[in-house]
């Protein structure tokens, strides 16, 4: 994983992913327990003045990891929907995908050479 960046940027990214997840339900993402938990945790681990705290770094790392997971899942679902196979294809459809046509019998049904 690359550099973490600022905690505010990570929080904004997590909230953006929450918005994507709640878009299907139609409910505002601010009404979810996940939103309240994230905001509460980031406010509780805010660094004041020159004080550095290990818990804040751990929270930021876990949040950045979770953000990476959520965005990767969303991208995977989008790619899967776009390129998912349609099941078993017939021989004619498979030939058409590569630009070929199957030969046709000149005499129709029951034709013998």
UniProtKB/Swiss-Prot annotation:
Keywords: Mitochondrion. Interacts with ATPAF2. Residues 90-113 are annotated as: Disordered. One of its GO terms (cellular component) is mitochondrion. It comes from the Eukaryota. It holds the Pfam family Complex1_LYR_2. It is found in: Mitochondrion. This is Protein FMC1 homolog. Belongs to the FMC1 family. GO terms for biological process: apoptotic mitochondrial changes; dopaminergic neuron differentiation; mitochondrial proton-transporting ATP synthase complex assembly; mitochondrion organization; motor behavior; negative regulation of lipid catabolic process; regulation of type B pancreatic cell proliferation; response to toxic substance. The keyword Mitochondrion applies. The keyword Mitochondrion applies. Plays a role in the assembly/stability of the mitochondrial membrane ATP synthase (F(1)F(0) ATP synthase or Complex V).
